Amino acid sequence: MWGLCKNHFPSNKIQVQERNKALKPKKSGSEHKTKQLFPVFNCKKKEKGVMIRFAILRNANTSLLSARSICLFTQAPTYCHVRLNTLNKSITTKRNSLTESKRHVHDGKHFFTTPHQQQQTKLGEIEEGHSPNIKEEDLRSIGQAITHQRNKRRKQIWSAIFGGIFGVIIGYSLIYKVIYLKEQSFLPLFPSSKIRKLSTRDLKKVDINQVQKLSKLRVLEILSGHDMIKEQYGVPLLDKDGNSPTLNEFSMWCEDQDPCVTGIVMEPDDKRDSSHTWYRIPFVCKWRITHRPISIRGTIDDLLNRIGLETADLFEIISPERVYGSFKYEYPLQGDSHALHLWFHGEIELDDDSLIVYNGKYHVDVKLQEIDLFRREKNGQLVQYVLYKNEAGDK
C-alpha cells in the first residue's frame, strides 16, 4: 500500500519539483507560486463528468493509515455518480422486460413467465438433480385429473337433463292426469310392430271356427274352377284317401293400419272389475303394458279442436274406409276407433307331394288374397304354382 501512496506524496523538494514539471504545465503569475507552496494531488474521473480534487500540504507529516484512507476516498464515486448509475440500470432493466413481454405476450405457454425465466428454471432443476421423467409423470397425472373432472361434470349435466325430463313426464302423466284429474293416461315407451297376436278380448269377438270353415269353402270353390286342378287332380277335389281335404294348420293374427307403440296405461285405482290384467299401486293407480296405434289424423283433429277448429274447416279427406262395405263398417271393434285387419293362414294337404297354402283377411266375410300349390316334381325339385292372387287386395 505504501508503494501505491508514495508516488502521490514525495519525500523531498527535488522530487516535488520534478513531478510538478512532468505532470502540470507551467502557469504564469500567482497560480505558479501557489502550486509551489501547495503540491496538488489530482484525481480526475472523466466518467459522467465527475472530477475530484484534493490538496495536501507539502511539509505535513502524514501517517500510513491516513494516506491509505485518503487514497481510497479519492478513488470512490460520489453520491450523484451512484444515483445516476442506479437510475440508468433500472431504466435499462425495465426497457428489456417490456421488450420481452411484448415479444412473448401471445405465447400461451409463457403467460405468467417469460421463456428466459422458464429456461433458467429448467436448467436449475437439472443442476439440482431432478429427473425430467418426474415432470412428465406430473403433467400426465394432471391431464388425467382434468379429463376425469370434465367427464364427471358432463355426466352430472346429462343426469340433470334426463332427470328433469323424467320428472316432467311422470308429473304430468301420473300426478296431474291420473291423481288430480282422475283420467286415464298413456305413457309411450318404444315403437312396436303392427302385427300382433289376437288378445283374449279379440278372441271373444271373433269366431275362429266359423272363419276356418268359410275359408276352406272359398278355397275349394276357387280350386274346382282351375284348369290345372281339373286336369291333374280332378273334380271334386279329394285327398289321397278319397275323402274331402282337411285343414292341417290354421292361424289368425291382427294388423293395425297405423303405426303402433308399446307403452304403459295408468288409471285411478277404483277397484272395478276389468277384462285386462292390471298391476296396482294401492291408493294411487293401476297400470298395465299395452300396444296402441298412433293416428296422425286423430292427433291433428285433437289439436284443431283445442283451438276451436275442425278438419272440415280446412280440408276434407274422403277415405275408402268411410265407404259402406269397407272394413271399418263391416267389423268395428267396440271401444276402438282405429282400423284393424284380421289375417288368417291355412294349409290343405292333397297328397304326400302336394300342399295347398292360402291366406286372406276376415271382416264379416272371408276375402282370399292368394292361393299357392307347392308340389315336389319327379326330379325331386320343389315347385310353387300360384293358382290365385287378388291384385286389388292390399296386404
Curated annotation (Swiss-Prot):
GO CC annotation: mitochondrial membrane
Family: Belongs to the AIM39 family.
Domain of life of the source: Eukaryota
Nuclease in keyword set: no
Protein name per UniProt: Altered inheritance of mitochondria protein 39, mitochondrial
Keyword terms: Membrane, Mitochondrion, Transit peptide, Transmembrane, Transmembrane helix
Transmembrane region(s): 161-181
Location(s) in or outside the cell: Mitochondrion membrane
Signal peptide: none
Organism: Saccharomyces cerevisiae (strain YJM789)
Membrane topology, from the record: Single-pass membrane protein
